[in-house]
């Protein structure tokens, strides 16, 4: 996690995800932007954007950049953004590969929607 502050632009939140080469980059970009759009408390200028940060040995590293809101709630903004990234990727069956990749599992490593609130998690409106 890192952030950048520019007097004219405000706070920009950054987060990285590594996704396998079998997932189209256009899909990954759309998923990350969807996660940003679901995150309350973020600003809208500049519009969220995605960079392809690196082409690794086993995964492409994408960087989501989104305008932050109140600097005093930075931790909550990152938490909400990361929760939405996890949910959106799970909803679409896309496995996040980082921080380490050891091989292709027989089944994708995602959390199915019906398992999002297993005990002791409290049920919330999905």
What are these regions (language model features)?
Residues 1-6, 11, 16-23, 33, ...:
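Solvent-exposed, non-transmembrane regulatory segments of membrane-associated proteins
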């Amino acid at each position: 996690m890192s952030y950048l502050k520019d007097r004219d632009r405000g706070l920009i939140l950054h987060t990285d995800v590594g996704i396998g080469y079998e997932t189209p980059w256009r899909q990954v970009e759309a998923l990350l932007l969807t996660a940003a759009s679901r995150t309350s408390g973020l600003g809208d200028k500049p519009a969220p954007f995605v960079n392809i940060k690196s082409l690794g040995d086993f995964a492409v590293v994408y960087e989501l950049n989104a305008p932050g809101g109140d600097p005093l709630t930075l931790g909550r903004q990152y938490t909400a953004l990361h929760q939405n990234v996890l949910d959106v990727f799970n909803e679409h069956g896309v496995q996040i590969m980082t921080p380490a990749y050891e091989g292709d599992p027989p089944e994708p490593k995602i959390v199915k929607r019906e398992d999002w609130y297993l005990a002791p998690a409290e049920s919330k409106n999905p």
